[in-house]
Every structure is written in C-alpha cells, then in structure tokens.
C-alpha cells in the first residue's frame, strides 16, 4: 500500500485526517525526533518502501565498488575527477552560480589559489577531500560555519557581501525562499539564538546511532533546509554535507553524483521540501526520507550504468590494441590515451603522458610521431591528444 502524505488526507478524507495522523504518530514503530515543524513534533515511519530502498542502496553500493575494482588505476582517477568536476559545476548551477569545467579543472591541476579562482577554490578543494576519505568534523554550529566558510564564503563575498552571515555562526535577520513568481514558499527559522538551538537538535539527530544511518542523513538534509541558517549558500552547504556523509556511509564516488541527480529531479526535490514544510503535514518526515533515498538510489544506478558501459567499451578497444600493437611502449601510450578518452575530460599532453607512464618526454614525443600511432590521434587542442575511437574501430 502506498504511503500518502498527510496533507493529501486533509482534502480527500477530512473526517479521518486526525485519526490517520494519530495512528501514524503513535505507531509503535515510529521514529520520533526532538524537533518541531510548526509546533508539531517530527516523526517518520519505517515503511516497506523505505526498507526496500535502503536495502537496494546498500546492495548496489557493493556492485559499484566491484565495478570500480575492474578499472585500471588511471581510468579510475580520471573518472573520479570527471565526476567531481561535474558535481561542483552542477551544485553551483542549481543555485544559479556560473562555473565552468575548465575553471574547476584548472584548480585541481594547479592546486594553488589565485585572485581569479578564489571564488571557487574552497568549494573545489572541499569536494576533492571526499575522494581521499578525509574526516570533516560536523558536530557543532562552529563546524557548520567552518564548512560554509570554506565552501562558499569567498564567492558570496565577491557577489554580494551583504549576504554573508552577520551573527556568531549564522544569520541574525529573517530570510525567505521564493518561487519564480516571487511567492514566499518558506521562511527560515528566525533569530540566530533559535537557529543555533535548532541546528544543535538537528546535529544531535544526525549523530544518534539508534537511528539507521541513511535515515539520519535524509532527516538532517531536510532539517538543514528547513532551518535555512544562512542568507545565501544554504543549498550548496547542505548538499556538500550530505555528499560527505554518503561518502563515509557508502562509497566516495556516490558523493560526486548527488547534485547531478538532484538537478535531474529538481521539481520533485523542491516539492518534497514544500509538502514537508506544510502545516498540514504535521511533522511527518516519511515522504521526504523516501524521496531523498530515491535520489541516492538513482545516483548509484546512474553510476553503475555509466561504469558498465565504459568498462565494456574499454575491454573492446583493449582487444583491438593488443592485437595490433606488440611493442610495450606503444601499447602503453595508446592504452593510456584510451583510458583518458573514455574516462577523462580533457586530452593529454606529451609531458603529462611521460609523467603518468614514467617515461622521458623525448620517448613519448617520438612515439607520437610514428605513423601507426599518429593516425589514431585526435588533437583538437594544440599539443594535446586523445584517441580517435572511430578510427580505432576500423583496425
């Protein structure tokens, strides 16, 4: 039986609305949270759908880990970086902040901060930490503010300094979220004292180990959005925290696909916030948890589909290379270019190839001039190379 949001019963079954709410809230399996939405204590139910989603998420995470193990190291590094770049670009895009793949790639390549890249540097570096399984403290309001500072404060300062937090940790004044037609759809918690109190409750829920991990992560994602602790940057900070938590609970690669899946389902994502915020929903978080778990599952499924396709193509082209190139250095160069063509974002220079293959630049440059190799190269950018897979197919 489908689990309908409470608000729906207010209009379709008014006579039973109170009894349906009461039966849900008092259900012996209900999880109760020390947090109120419009005066109603929050709760959720472990529906069959939530249990199935959770089970499938953990099962497919193991499939994803297995597929990662089938990739050559260079292919895995290139694929991870490609996903990271797309995640940063899309988490900005959701908020209407422009950033290009080239800007993000340059920060990852140079690892240095400049006046030109300062607005994105912190965001990129923070996401880059996820692939290395580094620990980030998310235990108190100071931690939340530190994450915000490192992620988005420079970009917000450059764009509109008045949108920077004016309290100890968070904003002091009120803030609202508006629809494209300028209708107020949500008003964040008012006053920094109350914001701090609510955030501390949300963090307690996040670290309450009596609650299943994916439920905690989903609930915290909602509560952060409901509290809306900053004037600007709430969405990016919230998504990063969820990405970090998922990287720890599941697999780091999943953390680089959350914004993409949210953007693909943006209407459903915002709608789940809207109806959970509604007074008639009476603090029932079950629907939001279900939708957020669906987003996590869709992220994993998309990664699996992508990797399965790329691994199949990799094996196909590897056989062509093995049949046609017996020289180890020639094969090594072409195999590297094959991995980059399938899994990377930008072509490789001879110097980069020399570094990756531990060969001299002269050796790589001379081999690239060989007719048997040169005919397979595509060079859309001067002195940078990819394999032309259409030509490789004909061998």
Language model features with spans:
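A generic short alpha-helical patch detector that favors 3-5-residue windows
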Residues: 56, 76, 80, 96, ...
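N-terminal structured helix/loop subdomain that forms the ligand-binding/catalytic interface
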Residues: 1-157
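Phosphate/pyrophosphate-binding active-site loops
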Residues: 2-49, 181-306
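Short amphipathic alpha-helical segments and their helix-coil junctions
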Residues: 60-71, 125-131, 200-206, 268-277, ...
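C-terminal regulatory or interaction extensions
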Residues: 221-229, 239-395
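Active-site core of Fic-domain adenylyltransferases
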Residues: 81-83, 89-231, 239, 243-256
């Amino acid at each position: 039986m489908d689990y309908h949001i409470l608000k729906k019963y207010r209009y379709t079954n008014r006579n039973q609305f109170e009894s349906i709410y009461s039966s849900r809230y008092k259900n012996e399996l209900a999880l109760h949270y020390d947090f109120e939405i419009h005066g109603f204590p929050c709760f959720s139910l472990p529906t069959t759908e939530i249990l199935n989603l959770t089970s499938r998420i953990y099962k497919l995470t193991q499939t994803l880990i297995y597929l990662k193990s089938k990739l050559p190291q260079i292919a895995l590094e290139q694929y991870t970086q490609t996903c990271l770049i797309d995640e940063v670009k899309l988490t900005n895009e959701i908020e209407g902040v422009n950033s290009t793949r080239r800007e993000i790639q340059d920060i990852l390549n140079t690892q240095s901060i400049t006046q030109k890249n300062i607005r994105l540097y912190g965001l990129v570096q923070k996401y880059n930490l996820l692939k290395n399984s580094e620990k980030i403290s998310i235990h108190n309001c100071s931690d939340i503010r530190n994450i915000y500072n490192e992620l988005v404060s420079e970009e917000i300062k450059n764009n509109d300094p008045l949108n920077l937090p004016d309290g100890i940790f968070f904003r002091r004044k009120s803030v609202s979220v508006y629809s494209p037609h300028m209708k107020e759809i949500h008003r964040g918690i008012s006053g920094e004292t109350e914001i701090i109190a609510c955030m501390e409750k949300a963090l307690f829920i996040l670290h309450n180990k009596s609650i299943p991990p994916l439920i905690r992560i989903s609930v915290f994602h909602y509560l952060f959005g409901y509290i809306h602790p900053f004037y600007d940057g709430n969405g990016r900070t919230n998504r990063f925290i969820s990405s970090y938590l998922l990287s720890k609970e599941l697999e780091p690669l999943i953390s680089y696909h959350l914004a993409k899946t949210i953007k693909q389902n943006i209407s459903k994502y915002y709608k789940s916030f809207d109806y959970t915020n509604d007074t008639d929903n009476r603090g029932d978080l079950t629907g939001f948890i279900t939708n957020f778990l669906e987003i996590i599952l869709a992220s994993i499924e998309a990664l699996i589909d992508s990797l399965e396709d790329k691994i199949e193509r990799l094996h196909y082209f590897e056989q062509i290379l093995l049949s046609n190139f017996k020289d180890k250095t020639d094969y090594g160069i072409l195999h590297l270019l094959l991995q980059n063509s399938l899994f990377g974002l930008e072509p490789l220079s001879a110097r980069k190839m020399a570094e990756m293959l531990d060969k001299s630049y002269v050796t790589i440059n001379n081999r690239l001039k060989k007719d048997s190799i040169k005919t397979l190269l595509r060079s859309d950018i001067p002195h940078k190379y990819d394999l032309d897979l259409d030509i490789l197919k004909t061998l």
